[in-house]
Swiss-Prot record:
It comes from Dictyostelium discoideum (Social amoeba). A motif (DEAD box) lies at residues 181-184. The gene is tifA. SMART domains: DEXDc (SM00487), HELICc (SM00490). This is Eukaryotic initiation factor 4A. One of its GO terms (molecular function) is ATP hydrolysis activity. ATP-dependent RNA helicase which is a subunit of the eIF4F complex involved in cap recognition and is required for mRNA binding to ribosome. In the current model of translation initiation, eIF4A unwinds RNA secondary structures in the 5'-UTR of mRNAs which is necessary to allow efficient binding of the small ribosomal subunit, and subsequent scanning for the initiator codon.
Length: 405
């Protein structure tokens, strides 16, 4: 056995850290440009072709440790460029002439796994690299066929990836890196055992990259199991709310008043695109029906819809065909919709840690955005808790809000 025992033990030589530690390892270099990272020429072309000019804060710090083969913990939330961070790191390490999976990326939802595939394919446009999305809701035989042709990177959900590995359709002997994206969400959804099982199939010494918006105790425990002397790139909590996003709340005395408030906001804004979050599938359906009855054009999406339908809805929203999308937290994790300028929390998130994921839909990469929270009298305590948790201030929305957005 090497330093990483397939039973899930790791002799990490004091590299574990406490939950409240929020620092970046002193060894982390800041690379101000992509050119200074020593990346392949064809990968650089893909990066610039994708529209990146200057690396974001997380990219400046995390790409180098990843391409140097270090186990890496990156605390980063939606809108920071984290997907491109680990995608660039993975693409730099792939040997193009080895037509077998070399990088495995696990994420909590099908949509996120497919989004990661799209980003990796776009960045590798000039590299002749095959990236496959291995997710549930699709025909097993399609996965088997694609994997048989030889792919370099697999982006998938833990259940389907484990299924493919146990069927011997996804060979693991050449895997050199496993990336765990949205690790906090994967654990909260109960994927811990499946991730452990996938890990046991990997070669000894596989590099682990873990990305998480929040470092819960479960995430910290996972790093201690899987990682050896990880490089840590951690942000202080008060840096977690994205710059450039104005946050407001609107007092609505009771639930019945929310709809009228939403209609008022809809009328007074020239919105590029907006996402409206509700806490339940039932509420999404009810609100969608109400909005359509009032002659507003809206789309809606939640987890009860079949995969194909969800993909069509995201596609039409991305293309701008639908301006307003009503959804549950299924969209709050990493679906990159560039034009979103407004997020409305019709319901405050049940889990305060989801607040950052929801408002991260707007203002991506420096684009300005607005988050509006509907707050019933009984929600005031939750709002204050969110403010305290993120060391941020959420102001009451002024009467002339349309002019300051």
């Amino acid at each position: 056995m090497s330093h990483k025992d397939r039973r899930g033990n790791s002799s990490n030589d004091g590299s574990s850290f406490k939950l409240n530690e929020t620092f970046t390892s002193s060894e982390v270099e800041v690379k101000p440009t992509f050119e200074s990272m020593g990346l392949r020429e064809e990968l650089l072309r893909g990066i610039f072709n994708y529209g990146f000019e200057k690396p974001s804060a997380i990219q400046q710090r995390a790409i180098l440790p990843i391409i140097k083969g270090r186990d890496t913990i990156a605390q980063a939330q939606s809108g920071t460029g984290k997907t491109a961070t680990f995608s660039i790191g993975a693409l730099q390490c792939v040997e193009v002439n080895v037509r077998s999976p070399q990088v495995l990326i696990l994420s909590p939802t099908r949509e996120l796994a497919q989004q990661i595939q799209k980003v990796a394919l776009a960045l590798s446009e000039f590299m002749n690299i095959q990236v496959h999305a291995c997710v549930g809701g699709k025909n097993l035989s399609d996965d088997v066929k694609k994997l048989e042709t030889g792919v370099h990177i697999v982006s998938g959900t833990p259940g389907r990836v484990l299924d493919m590995i146990t069927r011997k359709s996804l060979p693991t002997r050449h895997i050199k890196m496993m990336i765990l994206d949205e690790a906090d969400e994967m654990l909260s959804l109960g994927f811990q055992q499946q991730i452990n099982d996938v890990y046991r199939y990997l070669p000894n010494g596989t590099q682990i990259v873990l990305v998480s918006a929040t470092l819960t105790q479960d995430v910290v425990s996972m790093t201690e199991k899987f990682m050896t002397k990880p490089v840590r790139i951690l942000l202080k909590r008060d840096e977690l709310t994205l710059d450039g996003i104005k946050q407001f709340f609107v007092s609505v005395e009771k639930e019945d008043w929310k709809f009228g408030t939403l209609c008022d906001i809809y009328d007074s804004l020239t919105i590029t695109q907006a996402v409206i979050f509700c806490n339940t599938k039932k509420k999404v359906d009810q609100l969608t029906e109400q909005m359509r009855d009032a002659n507003f054009t809206v789309a809606s999406m939640h987890g009860d819809m079949v995969q194909k339908e969800r993909e069509e809805i995201i596609k039409s929203f991305r293309s701008g065909e639908n301006r307003v999308l009503i959804t549950t937290d299924i969209l709050a994790r990493g679906i990159d919709v560039q034009q979103v300028s407004l997020v409305i929390n019709y319901d405050l998130p049940i889990d305060r840690e989801n607040y950052i994921h929801r408002i991260g839909r707007s203002g991506r990469f420096g684009r300005k955005g607005v988050a509006i929270n509907f707050v019933k009298n009984s929600d005031i305590r939750i709002l204050r808790d969110i403010e305290q948790f993120y060391s941020t201030q959420i102001d009451e929305m002024p009467v002339n809000f349309a002019s300051i957005i």
